Amino acid sequence: MQQLNENKIIKLLRDNIPKLQLIYLFGSYSQGTQHRNSDIDIAVLAADTLDNIARWELAQKLASALDSDVDLVDLRSASTVLCQQVVTQGKQLWGTQQDDELFAVKTISMYQHLQAERQAIIDDVMANTAAKAHRGESL
C-alpha cells in the first residue's frame, strides 16, 4: 500500500476549484485504518457549490493521480451528519484555521439542532411502541 501524497491532493484541488476554502481527509485514511482496498475520502468547502459533473470529473483526476478510488464530497451540499463526521473525525489538509473553526462551529451547531429534532421523533416512536406492547398489539 502506497503512502498518501497529501501535497498532490492539495495542488490538484487548488488548481481546479475556484475560491477553495478547506480540504479535509476523512474516513479510513484520516484514522490510519486504511487497507489495500480502501478508497480515499476527501471533502472540500468552496465559496460556491460544486457542479456534480465537475466534481465527479475531479474525483476521477484525483483517482488517476493517486492510483486509488476517490470519494470527493462537496461540504456545501453534504448532509449535516456527514459534515459533522468530517469535522470531528477528519483531518484538515488545507485552509485557514479561521475557516476551519467557523465551519466546525456552524456544523456542530446544526448537528446539535438536528439531534434535538430527532430526539422528539424517537421519543414519540418509543412511546407508541411501548403503548402497543402494553395493549398486546403487534409491533
From Swiss-Prot:
Its cofactor is Mg(2+). Mg(2+) 2 binds at D39, D41. One of its GO terms (molecular function) is ATP binding. Disruption phenotype: When mntA-hepT is deleted, has a sight reduction in swimming motility. This gene cannot be deleted when the hepT gene is intact. It comes from the Bacteria. Its EC number is 2.7.7.108. Keywords: ATP-binding, DNA-binding, Magnesium, Metal-binding, Nucleotide-binding, Nucleotidyltransferase, Repressor, Toxin-antitoxin system, Transcription, Transcription regulation, Transferase. It catalyses: L-tyrosyl-[protein] + ATP = O-(5'-adenylyl)-L-tyrosyl-[protein] + diphosphate; O-(5'-adenylyl)-L-tyrosyl-[protein] + ATP = O-[5'-(adenylyl-(5'->3')-adenylyl)]-L-tyrosyl-[protein] + diphosphate; O-[5'-(adenylyl-(5'->3')-adenylyl)]-L-tyrosyl-[protein] + ATP = O-[5'-(adenylyl-(5'->3')-adenylyl-(5'->3')-adenylyl)]-L-tyrosyl-[protein] + diphosphate. It holds the Pfam family Polbeta. The keyword Heme does not apply. The keyword Transport does not apply. Induction: Expressed during exponential growth, part of the mntA-hepT operon. Under autocontrol by MntA. Forms a complex with cognate toxin HepT, may form a homodimer by itself. Forms a heterooctamer with cognate toxin HEPN with stoichiometry HepT(6):MntA(2). The 2 MNT subunits do not contact each other in the heterooctamer, each contacts 3 HEPN subunits, blocking access to the toxin active site. Belongs to the MntA antitoxin family. Has 2 alpha-helices that are important for interaction with cognate toxin HEPN; deletion of helix 2 (residues 52-65) or the C-terminus of helix 4 (residues 114-125) reduces antitoxin function about 100-fold, while deletion of the N-terminus of helix 4 (residues 98-113) reduces antitoxin function over 1000-fold. Antitoxin component of a type VII toxin-antitoxin (TA) system. Upon overexpression in situ or in E.coli neutralizes the effect of cognate toxin HepT. Neutralization is mostly due to tri-AMPylation of toxin by this enzyme. Successively tri-AMPylates HepT on 'Tyr-104'. Binds its own promoter, probably repressing its expression. The TA system confers plasmid stability in E.coli. This is Protein adenylyltransferase MntA. The gene is mntA.
